Swiss-Prot record:
NCBIfam families: tigrfam_recA. The keyword ATP-binding applies. PANTHER family: MITOCHONDRIAL DNA REPAIR PROTEIN RECA HOMOLOG-RELATED, RECA. This is Protein RecA. ATP binds at G66, P67, E68, S69, S70, G71, K72, T73. Gene3D superfamilies: P-loop containing nucleotide triphosphate hydrolases. It comes from Methylococcus capsulatus (strain ATCC 33009 / NCIMB 11132 / Bath).
Amino acid sequence: MDENKRKALGAALSQIEKQFGKGSVMRMGDVAAVRDIDVIPTGSLALDIALGCGGLPRGRIVEIYGPESSGKTTLTLEVIAQAQKTGGVAAFVDAEHALDPVYAEKIGVNLDDLLVSQPDTGEQALEIADVLVRSGGVDVVVIDSVAALTPKAELEGEMGDSHMGLQARLMSQALRKLTANIKRSNTLVIFINQIRMKIGVMFGNPETTTGGNALKFYASVRLDIRRSGAIKNGDEVIGNETRVKVVKNKVAPPFRTADFEILYGEGISREGELIDLGVNHDIVQKSGSWYSYGGDRIGQGKDNVRIYLKEHPEVAAAIEAAVREKALAGFQHAPSAERAALEESGF
């Protein structure tokens, strides 16, 4: 960099720090600037890998959307359970008034420590979320769902009244307020959203999400979750095969997909994922119908291996650690050549 430019930049930085406080602006190469992204695991190893950073990023807004009964709430409850396992505090803003505590407990959520709110209006729900975020004491806030955030004016009006754009304006205003507080408090905020059909679309995708366009822009990660099949035990359906597409990702490459199984009354099948990912990454060896790990046979057929891993959690943990290390090894933010040159010059 030119000497005069360097001096001018130095003076500008000094003025900004004097006016707005130290740390108002910093180089990404500085020790104080966070380059390694702090994440909360999703409960699905395949999805953690697809996200590219090992989980959902803290200090960001995440949108999870999909058709009815596709696993949206299950996925957020898995995230809450993972946050609680590491001592984190989670809040669930239940605008749909449909949270099933029995199912949440089966997934692994500690109900005694879970903060739950069932607000009457959309304004109340978003205000509660904002206060929780600003407190800095909550690690995960889930809003279920955007479609249920009904503006006060709509609730007080008559059935059949037109309230064009009210919800979109509410979301836009709330997200403007929330964004800076979310970053400052390093809180993960998850919005669950529903799908609607655009009328008269002849070409392209007719699907859209509720609540206007603001959430699409403010979200750092957007996940599209769908059922891809049924899991059967004989004639009985015991779960869903689920596919998640990362349609937007500001912290890693987007458009990756993750496939996993959601078992009824149990949540995401961790053992099933470990078998598939272990084979894909050459950590678990498959020969015919037999599976081996570390030179030892661990079962014949996927169902038997799943039972073995449930009975031997230390083996499951070792396979998971090996898969994470291999699949996420390349996730690093390297400084640019120009920044490296500036650091060498001592500026």
